[in-house]
């Protein structure tokens, strides 16, 4: 549908409504098309049936409009109407109707739709007139169909030699169509390629994160396994020693009980006293062993430093060592660099574990400093709060 703007009042009008607008607006002498911008004086606008589309308007210099099958058929249909107007057998009333029909660019090509369109657009309600117009169209269409078969029969012989070079030129035509693509199509292709690249990057990052997390979990599991294995081994080594001590005690007690009948009566009381002393010693040894077992593993024994107990437990007291270093410093304050150096040196001296890397140790150290409320970090220094 073509739209015009009135140069007198500036109102936009459809092509069908131009005559009505001219009767209202007396100064209307020139109309300009909204799409192409051309000016039409007087009745010249009637010949302007079709205008450029939005794709042609905004497509750029090298844009070529695609031919639609419907448009081709519609143009052929309107051509047929123009040919029928020139025929002498047509009545003047029907000729006027045909002239009005030729001004439209959306004329239906089927009987029911055509007659309905005539009633609504041209306000023709007499069935006899509608039948006359349609009969003229149907006769013209049937005459054309009768003439077409011989031309179709003659085409295959002529098309055989021309088909061979068409295969060679397919590549060049495809390249030309790609070069003449729209700006919109190019933008869409770029956006699609960018989206694909973003998705690929996200997948790669996700896979790298998964790979980085798995070995850490394995390391933790291995360390826990090593600790559990060390404790089991210590218990297994301690069990035979206990059994040996019990066997030795039982043998000595048996010897004390069975040793008296072959000896003299004078030696009897001395042996019984010695046996009592031995039993007392064994009971004292057993009580000492029980006391040692009852002691907690974290409590140090008398005369032994706390640092010697740490490797057997498998843990390093980060909080205690940091506190000790800060207490030794003046005003309970020291630089982060010095504190880090001293604490990690103490860790290596106490722990025999070489699995943990320097980066992990630094991460643990920073975590202990920042999350503990007893330590206050001010710029590059750490202070112990009371």
UniProtKB/Swiss-Prot annotation:
Residues 141-150, 164-174 have a biased composition (Polar residues). Zn(2+) 2 binds at residues 33, 36, 48, 51. A zinc finger (C2HC LYAR-type) spans 1-26, 28-52. GO terms for biological process: erythrocyte development; innate immune response; negative regulation of innate immune response; negative regulation of transcription by RNA polymerase II; positive regulation of phagocytosis; positive regulation of transcription by RNA polymerase I; rRNA processing. Residues 172-214 form a coiled coil. Zn(2+) 1 binds at residues 6, 9, 21, 25. Expressed in testis (at protein level). It comes from the Eukaryota. The keyword Signal does not apply. Residues 177-191, 198-211, 240-249 have a biased composition (Basic and acidic residues). Pfam families: zf-LYAR (PF08790), Zn_ribbon_ACC (PF17848). Residues 141-316 are annotated as: Disordered. It is found in: Nucleus, Nucleolus; Cytoplasm; Cell projection, Cilium, Photoreceptor outer segment. One of its GO terms (cellular component) is nucleolus. Keywords: Cell projection, Coiled coil, Cytoplasm, Immunity, Innate immunity, Isopeptide bond, Metal-binding, Nucleus, Repeat, Ubl conjugation, Zinc, Zinc-finger. GO terms for molecular function: DNA binding; DNA-binding transcription factor binding; identical protein binding; transcription regulator inhibitor activity; zinc ion binding. There is a cross-link at residues 14, 202 (Glycyl lysine isopeptide (Lys-Gly) (interchain with G-Cter in SUMO2)). Plays a role in the maintenance of the appropriate processing of 47S/45S pre-rRNA to 32S/30S pre-rRNAs and their subsequent processing to produce 18S and 28S rRNAs. Also acts at the level of transcription regulation. Along with PRMT5, binds embryonic globin promoter. Represses the expression of embryonic globin Hbb-y gene. In neuroblastoma cells, may also repress the expression of oxidative stress genes, including CHAC1, HMOX1, SLC7A11, ULBP1 and that encoding the small nucleolar RNA SNORD41. Preferentially binds to a DNA motif containing 5'-GGTTAT-3'. Interacts with PRMT5; this interaction is direct. Interacts with GNL2 and RPL23A. Interacts with nucleolin/NCL; this interaction is direct. Interacts with phosphorylated IRF3; this interaction impairs IRF3 DNA-binding activity. The N-terminal zinc-finger domains are required for the appropriate production of 28S rRNA and the formation of pre-60S particles. This is Cell growth-regulating nucleolar protein. The gene is Lyar.
């Amino acid at each position: 549908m073509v739209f015009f703007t009135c140069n007198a009042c500036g109102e936009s009008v459809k092509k069908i409504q131009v005559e009505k607008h001219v009767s209202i607006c007396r100064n209307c002498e020139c109309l300009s098309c909204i799409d192409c911008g051309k000016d039409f004086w007087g009745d010249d606008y009637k010949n302007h049936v079709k205008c450029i589309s939005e794709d042609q308007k905004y497509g750029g210099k090298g844009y070529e409009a695609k031919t639609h099958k419907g448009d081709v058929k519609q143009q052929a249909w309107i051509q047929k109407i123009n040919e029928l107007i020139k025929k002498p057998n047509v009545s003047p009333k029907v000729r006027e109707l045909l002239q009005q029909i030729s001004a439209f660019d959306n004329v239906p090509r089927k009987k029911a739709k055509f007659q309905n369109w005539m009633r609504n657009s041209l306000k023709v309600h007499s069935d006899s007139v509608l039948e006359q117009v349609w009969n003229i169209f149907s006769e013209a269409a049937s005459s054309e169909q009768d003439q077409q078969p011989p031309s179709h029969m003659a085409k295959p012989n002529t098309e055989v030699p021309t088909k061979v070079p068409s295969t060679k030129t397919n590549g060049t035509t495809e390249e030309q169509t790609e070069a003449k693509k729209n700006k919109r199509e190019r933008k869409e292709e770029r956006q699609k390629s960018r989206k694909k690249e973003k998705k690929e990057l996200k997948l790669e990052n996700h896979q790298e994160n998964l790979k980085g997390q798995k070995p850490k979990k394995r390391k933790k599991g291995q360390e826990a396994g090593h600790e559990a294995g060390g404790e089991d081994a210590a218990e297994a080594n301690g069990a035979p020693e206990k059994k040996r001590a019990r066997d030795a005690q039982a043998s000595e007690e048996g010897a004390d009980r069975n040793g008296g009948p072959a000896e003299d009566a004078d030696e009897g009381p001395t042996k019984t006293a010695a046996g009592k002393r031995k039993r007392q010693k064994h009971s004292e040894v057993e009580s000492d062993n029980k006391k040692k077992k009852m002691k907690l593993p974290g409590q140090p024994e008398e005369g032994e430093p706390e640092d010697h107990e740490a490797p057997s437990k498998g843990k390093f007291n980060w909080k205690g060592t940091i506190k000790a270093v800060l207490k030794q410093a003046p005003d309970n304050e020291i630089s982060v660099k010095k504190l880090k150096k001293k604490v990690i040196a103490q860790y290596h001296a106490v722990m025999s574990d070489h699995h943990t890397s320097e980066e992990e140790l630094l991460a643990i150290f920073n975590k202990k400093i920042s999350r503990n409320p007893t330590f206050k970090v001010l710029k590059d220094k750490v202070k112990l709060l009371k």
